[in-house]
Amino acid sequence: MRPYELMVIIDPEVEERTVEPSLQKFLNVITNDGGTIEKVDIWGRRRLAYEIKKKSEGIYAVVNFTAKPDTAKELDRQLSLNETIMRTKITRPEEQKVVAE
């Protein structure tokens, strides 16, 4: 199991109160495969740096989770198939290096 960070930009036409429940449907892929979800952080509506699909705003969400590499790929695939998801990015956070004194 590896730690991952998922950033999602959701279509701004979606109601903000329905973002977390709809995101939870996708995150079930992680829990069903034995992974864990550490934190779900909904940033809300933000201005985009450039237009995506002719939209200048999006609803940002960041999810920290632990899963197998294949599970992360499957989650990314399922998110990309959804029309309300404008962009996704899954990264592995850098490990903190301990400095010996």
UniProtKB/Swiss-Prot annotation:
Gene Ontology cellular-component annotations: cytoplasm; ribonucleoprotein complex; ribosome
InterPro entries recorded: Ribosomal_bS6 (IPR000529), Ribosomal_bS6_CS (IPR020815), Ribosomal_bS6_sf (IPR035980), Ribosomal_S6_plastid/chlpt (IPR020814), Transl_elong_EF1B/ribsomal_bS6 (IPR014717)
Keyword Protein transport annotated: no
Record bears the keyword Coiled coil: no
GO molecular function per UniProt: small ribosomal subunit rRNA binding; structural constituent of ribosome
UniProt entry keywords in alphabetical sequence: Ribonucleoprotein, Ribosomal protein, RNA-binding, rRNA-binding
GO BP terms, alphabetized: translation
PROSITE patterns with a match to the protein in the record: RIBOSOMAL_S6 (PS01048)
CDD domains: bS6
Superkingdom, taxonomy of origin: Bacteria
Task performed by this protein: Binds together with bS18 to 16S ribosomal RNA.
Protein family (similarity comment): Belongs to the bacterial ribosomal protein bS6 family.
Matching NCBIfam families: S6
Protein name: Small ribosomal subunit protein bS6
